[in-house]
Regions:
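Short amphipathic alpha-helix with an adjacent loop that forms part of the alpha/beta core around
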Residues: 61, 282-290
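ATP-dependent carboxylate/acyl-activation modules
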Residues: 178-180, 303, 307-308
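Acidic, Mg2+-coordinating active-site environments of NTP-dependent enzymes
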Residues: 67-190, 217, 242-251, 260-272
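Glycine-rich phosphate-binding loop signature in dinucleotide/nucleotide-binding domains
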Residues: 37-40, 160, 213-217, 288-294
Length: 313
């Protein structure tokens, strides 16, 4: 996620920091991250990923964090967590560990779910912060929703005594990579590349941002399946299609079996939509009929591989 990367960049303005590399955020990646730290490391920023309850608890037992940050409780990995309530319980395992071990949590004061989760653990030390601290702070992350990630990084930086100007400079200098919240200009089109991961919450936010922007040459949304949604998959993919088509998209490309099934169930009644079972099929279509002068969104789960389309855009 973008928040851990921003936090590490901000803290690196004052401390020797080692942070999670790539997607090493599971029961294998977290130990590898810890082993890569040296005696000179002053602060470690460890991303913890999970797709089911119990996984964050395991990672906390491995990493033994002193501080914790949950940016939100979204509709991710619903199949493994068994619904949003399971996501809340699973992420709450970080607060459980911190409360039991004298740790401190950074909590966004305007997020009622997170505030309630923290309050439920009465002995948890909490550092509340206001997302308004990010107002007017320049950054290169695509999407207004990334203001929340900027605010989280600023709150952590302030707590650890990083100079305010250096915090702002670090945020402004951070260039997103790994296909997260990036805007790119190619020889033919302008792209918003956000296909490192996708879940219903992030899909909704990305589409809202994309549809809200002005475009001279027309908008093309290329959406890849959101994986690990289980029984919620059909409804969530349908909701994403409806959101996209309610906006000013010129074309909507749907890549993957889940989106294809959702569209067929909807009756296939819009000529703007094109279906592709795989990313390779979409790439072949792009090679045959390339876009030019378009504003293009690439949003989907990493497993779909939408990043492979970039060379043809």
């Amino acid at each position: 996620m973008a928040s851990d990367l921003l936090v590490s960049r901000v803290l690196a303005e004052k401390y020797a920091v080692y942070a999670t590399q790539g997607n090493l955020n599971n029961h294998i990646g977290v130990p590898l991250t810890l082993l890569a730290m040296t005696r000179d490391t002053e602060l470690g920023v460890v991303e913890m990923g999970a797709s089911a309850c119990g996984e964050i608890a395991l990672l906390c037992a491995i990493a033994e964090p002193n501080f914790g940050l949950i940016t939100n409780v979204g509709r991710a990995h619903l199949e493994g967590f068994g619904g949003v309530e399971g996501v809340r319980r699973g992420k709450g395992e970080l607060y459980d560990y911190l409360a039991a071990n004298g740790g401190r949590a950074f909590v966004r004061r305007d997020d009622g779910t997170l505030v309630k989760m923290a309050a439920e653990r009465g002995n948890l030390a909490v550092e509340l912060y206001d997302p308004a601290i990010a107002d007017g702070v320049g950054h290169r992350l695509e999407g207004a929703f990334n203001r929340l990630n900027v605010a989280a990084a600023m709150a952590v930086g302030r707590y650890f005594g990083v100079d305010e100007e250096r915090i702002r400079d670090a945020v402004a200098a951070y260039r997103p990579d790994n296909n997260r919240s990036q805007r790119r200009s190619t020889a033919r089109n302008t792209l918003v590349v956000d296909c490192y991961n996708a879940n219903p919450s992030s899909m909704q936010a990305s589409l809202a941002n994309f549809l809200g922007e002005e475009s001279v040459g027309g908008k093309v949304a290329v959406l890849g399946d959101m994986l690990e949604l289980g029984a919620w998959s059909a409804a969530e993919h349908r909701a994403a299609v409806e959101q996209a088509l309610a906006g000013d998209v010129e074309q909507l490309w749907l890549v993957g079996t889940e989106f294809s099934a959702a569209w067929r169930a909807m009756g296939c009644g819009d000529e703007r939509v094109r279906l592709f079972a795989t990313c390779d099929e979409a790439a072949a279509a792009l090679q045959a009929s390339p876009f030019a002068g378009k504003f293009v969104l690439l949003k989907g789960s990493h497993g779909i591989g939408l990043e492979r389309l970039i060379e043809w855009l």
